[in-house]
Every structure is written in structure tokens, then in C-alpha cells.
Amino acid sequence: MKTSIHPNYNDVQIICSCGNTFKTRSTIDKKELHLDVCSSCHPFYTGKQKIMDSAGRVEKFKSRYASFKR
């Protein structure tokens, strides 16, 4: 078996935008990983519908098509 071919497996602190944090292990080189959604705030797991738009895509869409009427 070859030695030293696997990446390092590090402890990582996961931080969600909702404030939830937890620790896991990963091969990334960072100590912290920031997420937009996690299982505590994702609509599938919470059962609540909400628009999750962190990049302003909904507002951009509405402004682009505001002149069109049904």
C-alpha cells in the first residue's frame, strides 16, 4: 500500500448564517467553513417555506420583468 497519498483530515468548525455551529472533520485546509444554510434552517428540514436568496437574484428578476403585465 502506498504511503502519504491521502490528504490530511482536519477538524473544521462549520458556521451557518443562521448562527448554528458544529464541528466535523474534513480534508479542507480551513479551520472554519461558512454556510448559507444548514439542517437547522433549511426549509426541507424545518417544514417552513421561505425564499432563500443570498445573492439578490429574486430582486434582480423582479426588476427585470416588472414592466411585463399579465
Curated annotation (Swiss-Prot):
Binding site for Zn(2+): 16, 18, 38, 41
Cofactor entry: Zn(2+)
An individual GO BP term: translation
GO cellular component, one term: ribosome
Pfam family, one: Ribosomal_L31
GO molecular function list: metal ion binding; rRNA binding; structural constituent of ribosome
Keywords: Metal-binding, Ribonucleoprotein, Ribosomal protein, RNA-binding, rRNA-binding, Zinc
Statement: the UniProt record of this protein carries the keyword Ribosomal protein: yes
Cofactor note: Binds 1 zinc ion per subunit.
Keyword Transport: no
Signal peptide feature range: none
Entries under Gene3D superfamilies matching the protein: Ribosomal protein L31
Subunit and partners: Part of the 50S ribosomal subunit.
Entry's family note: Belongs to the bacterial ribosomal protein bL31 family. Type A subfamily.
Function: Binds the 23S rRNA.
Protein name (record): Large ribosomal subunit protein bL31
Lineage of origin: Bacteria, Pseudomonadati, Pseudomonadota, Gammaproteobacteria, Candidatus Pseudothioglobaceae
Gene designation: rpmE
